[in-house]
């Protein structure tokens, strides 16, 4: 653990300063004895020597620092709050802040800052820890070798946790040179520093531990590089480093997890599962020593792989197994202290990173949403959003749960086709007075609040509006200029962690503008193009929800904003025109609505491919084909430009009806019907045909359309009706007539 070497280095620093200050031999001997006792794990003797030092020199705060670290280790690293409080007091006593470190004179306080950075790391305050670590890195040259390595390893870990991969890779190159140079100096007899490996038995679990042998340090560097390349999806570079990891670490659980993650990115899902199953997680140290529940990570990674394969039910099973393992691990930890001053005490400091419950809840919610169980997904995601409330993507997923829960889920809709059931609600009366009651098509817009506040987390359209408003507010207000690439709707994300912690805020001072992102924990951060795609998705959902709630002005406003987006996919552009037209019709602006319903507005209905996926495919560098992803998500309706233009024509006909332009409406209806198969005609179009025939006085033809539940060509049917009685009672069964396709009828 990083604090381990901090304690050793603190004592060594005190000894070095004693030599410079000309203090007595007694103080030197006590300092040396304290260091030896600490290294040997004899913390009682170490504290005794430090107490004697404090009696001699009461003004040296380094003695107090070393005593605090020794007390921390004596308690088996369970007094985190006390150590944090002592460090804060010492910082106030020396009147020094991290921002004030501007010269080498402040290097003497480096041990204090480093220990604070380690505590911030375990408290998941990553940005604060990075701020301290970067200040220390500026003065790394005068540091001793072991301490310099510790600072670099800690910073690398923090950069990876905050997705600053370029900084992490740069620092790894520097660290590699430092280790090679130090090894060369040792071989030449230039380094006479005493090196103890007594505390290196927990190498992999220790964060930022620089006092390790060269081979172990090289292996650790290779593992960090693999994690960085996996984040960058640079598969060629990752493949080279994976070989180095396997050569240096063998078939250890961390190396096999990393290789499995690599195969997962390549699309070799079966191989990824095989690698996970071959890892002997039973031999890996327990979470009490490392802070990492390997069993939890094992099941979580299996869930992610099966999610990518399209096996969502199996993926959900594995995520629930991971959640069960996580809860079992947390149950073994002492309950949280009610005293705010001892919130993090009573448990080893490394176990502060053990609980991954909310990441797993997020994964379960996404899986359930894909399965088609929005209400169950809502329950999981509502709990996750209490922690990850700054994630705009998560708020969108919550809104999608609400929309799906309040939307019809007929069998035809799930297959991507419109429903044609429910045109006739009932039949009333008898004989001459027999009437057909048509079902209302606007039932889905009748929402009830039941007097409850819309802020209460319930899967309602009112709560969906709040979620979407939050998502829009969390996205950057200013449009970011980007390269001219084809955008796409943001896809659902799951977390695939091998030894990861919780994501946090990230630095914005990146070297390349294209790499700017906003955090979206627990999933990966949103890159520039993903932000634009997500904004388009949110605007489309807001317009839909506003229409459902009857807020037509809000719907029109957001639909127009959607159409103004520079990187708009074809499918969302189609929806934008439809939502804008519906809002305008409700506002009695039919002429403006007709402009939006022009079929020529639809030229593409694809969801698009994100740049990240394109880069991943181009960087594959392999001749072997990727595995099939299993059961794919069905294409949303409409699945083609023809279907989309047909939908536009049906709606355009409805708009013409509102202006009593029935001839134009009939032309739109017949033109649309000739473009698609009769079974794909939506029920709204059939009702429109019934309305037009009633307006034209063709009652019998309207009845025939209702009975057959399909459109009928007017000319053919009128000629048939002249040869048959004009009226048939509704209770008599009618023999089905095989009707020709619309194209054939029109040719005749």
UniProtKB/Swiss-Prot annotation:
Give the highest taxon in the source lineage.
Eukaryota
- Stretches the record annotates as Disordered: 1-25, 483-524, 605-634
The UniProt regions of compositional bias labelled Polar residues, in chain numbering, are: 487-509, 605-615
Q: Which GO terms describe its cellular component?
A: CCR4-NOT complex; cytoplasm; nucleus
- Record field: compositional bias (Basic and acidic residues): 1-16
Q: Which Gene3D superfamilies match?
A: Tetratricopeptide repeat domain (1.25.40.10)
| A GO biological process held by the record | negative regulation of translation
Cellular location of this protein? Cytoplasm; Nucleus
Q: What keywords tag this UniProt record?
A: Cytoplasm, Nucleus, RNA-mediated gene silencing, Transcription, Transcription regulation, Translation regulation
| Role summary | Component of the CCR4-NOT complex which is one of the major cellular mRNA deadenylases and is linked to various cellular processes including bulk mRNA degradation, miRNA-mediated repression, translational repression during translational initiation and general transcription regulation. Additional complex functions may be a consequence of its influence on mRNA expression. Is not required for association of CNOT7 to the CCR4-NOT complex.
Describe the subunit structure. Component of the CCR4-NOT complex. cnot10 and cnot11 form a subcomplex docked to the cnot1 scaffold.
> What family is it from?
Belongs to the CNOT10 family.
What PANTHER family does this protein map onto?
CCR4-NOT TRANSCRIPTION COMPLEX SUBUNIT 10 (PTHR12979:SF5)
Q: What is this protein called?
A: CCR4-NOT transcription complex subunit 10-B
The species this protein belongs to is: Xenopus laevis
């Amino acid at each position: 653990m990083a604090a381990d070497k901090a304690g050793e280095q603190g004592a060594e620093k005190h000894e070095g300063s004693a030599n410079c200050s000309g203090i007595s031999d007694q103080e030197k001997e006590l300092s040396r004895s304290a260091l030896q006792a600490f290294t040997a794990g004899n913390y009682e003797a170490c504290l005794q020597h430090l107490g004697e030092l404090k009696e001699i020199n009461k003004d040296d705060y380094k003695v107090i620092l070393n005593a605090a670290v020794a007390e921390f280790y004596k308690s088996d690293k369970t007094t985190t709050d006390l150590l944090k409080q002592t460090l804060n007091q010492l910082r106030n006593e020396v009147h020094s802040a991290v921002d004030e470190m501007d010269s080498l004179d402040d290097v003497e306080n480096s041990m204090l800052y480093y220990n604070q950075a380690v505590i911030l790391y375990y408290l998941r305050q990553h940005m604060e820890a990075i701020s301290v670590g970067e200040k220390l890195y500026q003065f790394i040259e005068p540091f001793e070798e072991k301490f310099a390595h510790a600072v670099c390893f800690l910073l690398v870990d923090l950069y990876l946790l905050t997705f600053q991969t370029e900084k992490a890779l740069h620092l790894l190159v520097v660290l590699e040179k430092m280790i090679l140079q130090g090894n060369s100096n040792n071989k030449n007899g230039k380094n006479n520093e005493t090196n103890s490996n007594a505390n290196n038995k927990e190498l992999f679990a220790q964060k930022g531990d620089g006092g390790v042998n060269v081979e172990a340090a090289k292996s650790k560097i290779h593992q960090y590089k693999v994690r960085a390349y996996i984040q960058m999806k640079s598969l060629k570079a990752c493949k080279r480093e994976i070989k180095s990891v396997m050569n240096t670490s063998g078939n250890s659980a961390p190396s096999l997890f990393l290789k499995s993650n690599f195969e997962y990115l390549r699309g070799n899902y079966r191989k990824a599962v095989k690698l996970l199953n071959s890892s002997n997680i039973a031999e890996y140290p327990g979470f009490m020593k490392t802070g990492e529940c390997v069993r939890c990570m094992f099941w979580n990674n299996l869930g992610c792989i099966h999610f990518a394969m399209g096996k969502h039910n199996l993926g959900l099973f594995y995520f629930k197994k991971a959640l069960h393992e996580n809860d079992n691990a947390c149950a073994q930890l002492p309950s949280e202290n009610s005293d705010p001053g001892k919130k993090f005490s009573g448990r080893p400091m490394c176990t502060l990173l053990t609980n991954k419950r909310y990441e797993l809840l997020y994964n379960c919610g996404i899986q359930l949403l894909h399965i088609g169980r929005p209400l169950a997904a809502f329950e999981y995601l509502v709990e996750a959003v209490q922690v990850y409330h700054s994630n705009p993507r998560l708020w969108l997923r919550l809104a999608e749960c609400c929309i799906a829960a309040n939307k019809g889920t007929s069998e035809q809709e799930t297959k991507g086709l419109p429903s044609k059931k429910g045109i006739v609600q009932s039949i009333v009366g008898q004989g001459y007075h027999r009437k057909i009651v048509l079902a209302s098509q606007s039932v889905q817009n009748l929402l009830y609040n039941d007097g409850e506040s819309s802020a209460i987390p319930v899967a309602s359209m009112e709560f969906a509006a709040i979620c979407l408003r939050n998502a829009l507010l969390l996205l950057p207000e200013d449009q970011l200029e980007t390269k001219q690439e084809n955008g796409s709707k943001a896809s659902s994300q799951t977390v695939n962690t091998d030894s990861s912690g919780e994501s946090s805020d990230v630095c914005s001072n990146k070297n390349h503008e294209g790499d700017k992102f906003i955090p979206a924990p627990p999933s990966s951060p949103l890159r520039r193009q993903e932000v634009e795609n997500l904004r388009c998705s949110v605007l489309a959902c807001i317009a839909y929800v506003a229409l459902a709630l009857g807020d037509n002005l809000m719907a029109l406003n957001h639909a127009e904003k959607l159409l103004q987006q520079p990187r708009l996919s074809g499918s969302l552009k189609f929806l934008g025109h439809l939502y804008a037209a519906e809002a305008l019709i409700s506002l009695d602006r039919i002429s403006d609505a007709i402009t939006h319903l022009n079929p020529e507005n639809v030229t593409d209905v694809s969801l698009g491919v994100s740049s990240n996926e394109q880069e991943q495919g181009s960087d594959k560098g392999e001749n072997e084909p990727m595995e099939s992803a299993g059961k794919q998500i069905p294409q949303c309706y409409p699945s083609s430009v023809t279907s989309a233009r047909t939908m536009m024509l049906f709606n355009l006909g409805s708009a013409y009806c509102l202006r009593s332009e029935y001839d134009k409406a009939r032309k739109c209806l017949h033109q649309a019907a000739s473009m698609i198969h009769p079974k794909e005609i939506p029920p709204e179009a059939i009702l429109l045909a019934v309305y037009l025939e009633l307006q034209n006085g063709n009652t019998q033809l309207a009845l025939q359309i209702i009975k057959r539940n399909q459109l009928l060509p007017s000319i053919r049917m009128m000629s048939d009706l002249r040869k048959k009685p004009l009226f048939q009672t509704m209770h008599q069964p009618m023999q089905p007539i095989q009707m020709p396709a619309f194209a054939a009828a029109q040719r005749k």
